[in-house]
């Protein structure tokens, strides 16, 4: 399976390193639309959503990602990636990809200094607690029909799935746990 990490900004290397640990995965850093269109799955990493959103438009990557979604290719957005996927952003008038029926709040847990780690129990993902790293993290304020809430932290939605789309407010790539990767890759079957 050919799995790409959108390689324009953010935690690209960390996602690539995790994918390389999974047997049968060809990890690809996707920096152009031609590469994007060859993928069996795509991860949109954390970073700065406004900067990534601008790059998506300026380099024609947005249309390629929208085509992947039309083909029901699994797409996973972590942190900023989740913001980019959201149909609505509460504290920002921009709409980037708008492919997932969620409403998110950017920097919901505060600034960089308010970043934190915690452990979450997410039965759909793992029988064990999962470490979750939140860095200037968003959260999901509401979900539309057909969106499955996977995890909450202090009453706020921090992980969700809608068909082929997965979104996490936190950074699984910064932990040793591959559970979210394995779950994501099963969306392709």
Curated annotation (Swiss-Prot):
Catalyzes the hydrolysis of glutamine to glutamate and ammonia as part of the biosynthesis of pyridoxal 5'-phosphate. The resulting ammonia molecule is channeled to the active site of PdxS. It comes from the Bacteria. The gene is pdxT. Pathway: Cofactor biosynthesis; pyridoxal 5'-phosphate biosynthesis. One of its GO terms (molecular function) is pyridoxal 5'-phosphate synthase (glutamine hydrolysing) activity. InterPro entries: Class_I_gatase-like (IPR029062), PdxT/SNO (IPR002161), PdxT/SNO_CS (IPR021196). This is Pyridoxal 5'-phosphate synthase subunit PdxT. HAMAP family: PdxT (MF_01615).
